[in-house]
Structure formats: C-alpha cells, structure tokens
A protein has these predicted regions:
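C-terminal and inter-domain tail/linker signature
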Residues: 1-139
Length: 139
C-alpha cells in the first residue's frame, strides 16, 4: 500500500500542481476528503478546486519538486520545494512580478486510492515577504 500511495502523491504534485490538471483533483479527492492547513479546511473536490484556481492564478508557473517522501500504512509524508513567479492576483494581492521560492511539508492519508485527508504546512510568511505584502521589521 505504501508504494501505491507514494505514486499517488507523485501524481498529485505532477498533475495538479505542476501541470494544473483539475481532472486529477476529481479523480483523487472524494466528497469525504478534507484538506487542512490552507486557511479554512477544504472539504471535497469543489472546495479544493476553488483554492487551486486562486493559487494558480497568482502563481501560474508554479513548479513543485518532491525533496523527500516516506510512507507507512495509509499515510505519506512529503517534504517539497517550490518556485514560481507572482504574476496574478488570485490570492487577493496585486501581482508583483517577483520570483519566489518556498518549501513545505504535507501528510496525506489514503483509502482505496483516494486522498481522504491531507495536512499542509509551508512558509506562508516567507512567501508573503517575497511578494512584498509583508515587510520584515527594521532591526
């Protein structure tokens, strides 16, 4: 099961994030799926697709690389790094045109080849600093 679930995570990052394929969201999420850590919990494919559309609008060229991945039973933990250009206003901030790099970690729980629950944590503050929305305090 661990090997199959790791393949699903690879597919998720490749197709959903790097290629922007929303059909994969419908294939891998169910109405029972809950994604945590991206603001309010996202429940089901439609809620995730709304977040995904806003994010891809803000960073249409996002590329995510999997740096490390471990799996046990129905869980997969992944450490990833991303690069993109902030060229859209999908997240509510005017496009800055700035290149960004950030990293994060996630844990995905699978049942019957479906992503049922996901937990996400990434450097949101660093990302906001890079696009000029949040300034570092003067030292």
């Amino acid at each position: 099961m661990s090997t199959e679930n790791k393949a699903l995570v690879r597919r998720w990052f490749k197709e959903v994030w790097n290629e922007g394929n929303t059909k994969t969201i419908d294939e891998l999420l169910t109405d029972r799926s809950v994604i945590h850590g991206l603001g309010e919990d996202l429940r089901g494919p439609a809620a995730f697709k709304s977040f995904h559309a806003a994010y891809r609008d803000a960073f249409p060229d996002v590329k995510i690389q999997i740096d490390r991945m471990v799996a046990e039973d129905d869980l997969v933990a992944v450490h990833w790094s991303a690069s993109a250009t902030h060229s859209g206003s999908g997240l509510g901030f005017a496009a800055s045109g700035r290149p960004v790099k950030f990293s994060g970690m996630g844990i995905a729980r699978f049942e019957a080849n479906k992503l049922i629950e996901g937990w996400n944590n990434f450097d949101q503050l660093g990302l906001l600093q890079q696009i000029g929305v949040v300034a570092l305090p003067a030292s």
